[in-house]
Amino acid sequence: MDFNFTQNENDFRQEIKDWLSKNLSQRISNKVKKFQRLDKNDYEEFMKALSAKGWLAVNWPKEHGGTGWSNTQKHIFEEEIVKAGAPRIVPFGLNMLGPVLMEFGNEKQKKYYLPRILNCDDWWAQGYSEPGSGSDLASLKTKAVDHGDHYICLLYTSDAADEHSW
């Protein structure tokens, strides 16, 4: 069994390296390599560049804007973005909501939300990851303040404290 990469796979690797050298800012790469905190703008800058290239949704099918890559291509891509010092791709919309919508969403939902995830217009978060609880749903605590005809509930969400969509 030959475990070497094929010439096409090596060419693909080189294409990724070349693209990263031109599209991953040194500022962001330096922050990643120095383990400095990245803000939303840093993630968004890189993810929008990947989206423009068509490389953001590596696990999505082509018909929904994904790459259609093989598992080997996905591996090569992940390996090269790590080597280059790229930020991780923020996964909630891409890896959690998107696949659920593709499987169970109606056409209107797919048409509206999937492109917004790919364009970084919408950022999704795991709504049950709270301070002091993590993903332990039984330990979640909040309060509801009565405002007459509605209540205000205070919740914190990991990686999206400044984001909301009503």
Where are these regions (language model features)?
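Active-site-adjacent elements of ketosynthase-type condensing enzymes
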Residues: 132-140
